[in-house]
């Protein structure tokens, strides 16, 4: 279960905690995150030792837990040295409040610096990163994936279906589904994805999925999970049946010829600068 202190101002953690009470602690894995402001004060956000220690305690209270399996830095903090952040997270592991720690949406340079701090001070290793990754956004392939593979860092991806674009619910030339994210003007992320180019790609990907006898969502999730460095994907669902259908991706292997066809459709060009 993936959560964060900032989701609905702590209400999401409290709600999740109320549900988890029914289950033995060893039967589930739960994570939370820290960074975004939780109040108006200067120490109410960021990745300082003070905020991490205080907010982790609050997250544990919210969820009624003694420890978290995973604790993420929700974003990088330009105002706090990475050394302070990583050493604090190591202290939280030693204190038994978290088992592993990770970072989300950090740059390759920031991840590399964190790994350097771990090596220099012989700390508990950076276990995992949580970036956005899906067929339409492959930024992490340029540098981050290789960096993680070389250093034994896992990758758990959020938004693997591109805010619903890769479910096939948004079709070229068709009205937006009633009640979908794209019908809300405030949700700029999905609306920015609904370009003519992306919708054309979706139509072609739907044909590939049809030929393989799976949904576009299963195809998109399997495409991510085939990467050795990807340990899991974080999928949201508004209905239980959506989750059940998407779970089929864990056992589906995309044939090599279909992978080649997908690459042609996506037409991805790595962002590599020439030197000299």
Identify the residue ranges that each predicted region occupies.
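Active-site mouth loops of central-metabolism enzymes
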Residues: 38-53, 74-80
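N-terminal binding-site loop/beta-alpha segment at the start of enzyme catalytic domains
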Residues: 2-28, 94
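Short, acidic/polar
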Residues: 46-63, 111-116
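A short acidic, helix-capping loop that chelates divalent metal ions and anchors anionic groups
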Residues: 37-43, 166, 242
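A short, structured active-site edge motif that brings together acidic residues
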Residues: 26-39, 129-130
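Beta/alpha (TIM)-barrel catalytic core signal, keyed to glycine-rich beta->alpha loops juxtaposed to Asp/Glu
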Residues: 80-266
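Glycine-centered flexible beta-alpha turn that most often forms the glycine-rich phosphate-binding loop
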Residues: 1, 68, 101
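Active-site groove signature of glycoside hydrolases
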Residues: 60-81
